[in-house]
Structures are given as C-alpha cells and as structure tokens.
Amino acid sequence: MNLIPLAQGRSSIELAEIKHWVERSAGGRVPSKVGVISVESPVRRKNDEMVNFEELQLISAYARENGIRLHLDGARMFNLHFHSGKSVKQYAALFDSVYVSLWKHFNGASGAILAGDTKFIEGMFHTRRMFGGSLPHAWPQVAVVSQYLDSYESDYEKSWQATDELIALLQSDNRFKIEKVPNGTSRFLLLIPGVTADGFIERALEHGVMMPHPHAVTGVFQMQVNPTILRTTPEKLARVFMN
C-alpha cells in the first residue's frame, strides 16, 4: 500500500492535487491505480478547521467517475453542520465509508462507528477482530451514547452561543487576546500575555475549570468548545478567568 499525503500545511484538499496524482500513478513505468481517497474533516492538526464542502463535492464526483472509493475521517463531523450549514447526511452522501467517534461527541468511554453500504460492512468484523476489537463486554464503553446523540447538534450550537458571550466578556479586558480559527469549528485561540501558564491552569482548576496546556512555543491556549460549557454561565466563567 502506497500512501500519498496531500494538502500539506492546509486543511482543504483540492481536486487539482488529486487529479495530478491519479494521472501520475496511472502513467508510471508500472501503472498503479489509486484505489481510495481519505479525507479528514474537521482536521485535528489544523485546529479543527473544516474542509471546503464545495471542493468535497467536486472530489466526490471525480472519484466516482474514475472508480475511486472515498472515505471520510469524520471523528468530529457532528460539529460541521453549525459552521457549514451542511447536514451530516449531506457530508456522508459524498463518501463510501464514514468514521465517527463516539467519545469525542457523545461521551462514550471509547469506541467509534464505521458506516458504509452492506457490501462493505458485511464481514468487517473479521478485520475488527484482527486488531483486537472483539471484546465480549465492550457495551459499557458506549452505554451512555444514546443519551447524548439526539441532542448533540442542538447542544453544540448552544455551546457556541455561550462561548461567544464568554469571548465578548474576556475581550472587554485587554489582558486577554482571542482569535477565532478561519474555517474553524470547535476551537478558538486564547493568549494571556505576562501570565505564567502553570499558575493560571492551577488557579482555574481550583474553581472547577480545566484548562488545556498552552502551545510550548507561542503560549497560546487551544480552547475546545463543547457542551461542558453549559454547566455554568459565561459570566461565572469570565470571573474565573479575570480573577
């Protein structure tokens, strides 16, 4: 298997790149057909930026014209609708198989769903077993998922409403520098110049707020937006940060 990474340093892959490699692979001394295109969206290593939906449509049409399968690494794909206006079904319809995390969205202790047509999924349990996925008592890992599934997208929208209120409150204090990620989804960037990160994290934790560790070079906190913010109010959170 020959893996070819594309879109270096970017979140959105472009059809032109794919065409180049499909044609190059087919035209070598030993022709090698591209069998699968895998796309991640949102892209974790790019601060959860989302891939351009219109570009995905072009890629999907091209892949199907050329007999190439498409896989979506959509671990956090239930966040996409709020930002792109496109539903989970609209995204999934462009792909032959889709991966969704159960713990990143729905509070499962672990686990994921791999979805696809019957022909693809039938017999997949043999592959799962090969990688140790046949635990006889795995149900506790996903027992709570159904409790959060139906309301997740609504809860996520409310989470961003609360986050925007928090950001507005913090921006009224010039000690805080905040940036939203272009084409972003569930993350914003927070910088607090002149503050010792370890001390800030410790003081926040004393008030029940768990902070991520900042970037080792820039000192930026990569703040994740999720429904845990709804456990309190933006005003209370802002007071914790400011004090």
Region locations from a protein language model:
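PLP-dependent aminotransferase-class I/II
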Residues: M1-K46, M50-E55
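Hydrophobic beta-strand scaffold residues
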Residues: L3, L70-H71, M211
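Active-site C-terminal subdomain of aminotransferase-like
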Residues: K33-R45, M50, S87, A93-N174, ...
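Structural preference for beta-strand elements that scaffold enzyme active sites
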Residues: V36, G67-H71, S97, V220-Q222
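Active-site-proximal loop/turn and secondary-structure-junction residues that shape catalytic pockets
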Residues: V43, R76-F78, K104, P227-I229
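Catalytic PLP-binding core of fold-type I/II PLP enzymes
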Residues: E49-H81
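Distinct, well-ordered alpha-helical segments
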Residues: H81-K89
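Conserved C-terminal alpha-helix-loop-beta "cap" of PLP-dependent enzymes
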Residues: Q171, R175-M242
